[in-house]
Amino acid sequence: MPDTIPRRTTTPCAASVRLEGGDRLDVTFWLLPDPQRELGVTPLRLLLEEDRRFFPVGLADSSSGLLSRDALVTVEIDADGPGTEPAPAEGTALDLVTLHLVSGEEISGILRSTALEGYGRMSDVFNSFGRFVPIGLGTRLVFVATARVARVSF
């Protein structure tokens, strides 16, 4: 039977995910169009923050699967690829931070945040993030699950 369900055009976003327990998977997230955004697609950050427990993904063997948000530790994408967001022109602060995960692993990178009046402390910055905090690592952008962060040093 032919597929008669109309589907929206999506943009593939290649990612490497690390799951609780240490397994790594190369996957593809499918980003919906968003003409209101500069890059024309919904940023991966917004997809990860949506109120859903499972994410549909493409797998390396061309099959499909579902990833549990609760099992995600990190989601890593190309910093110049689809799924990223342009940096605001003004009011952006860059800080070198180290995230100490509950597993004992450390992730060091650049935290980009927008200064909000009255919210200048690092605790304010981290409390403003949702389920994931984006950290720049050279040419990569890593979304780290905030539930997996034990402490932050800067």
Label the model's feature ranges:
Residues 1-154:
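Conserved RNA-binding domains used in RNP assembly and mRNA/RNA metabolism
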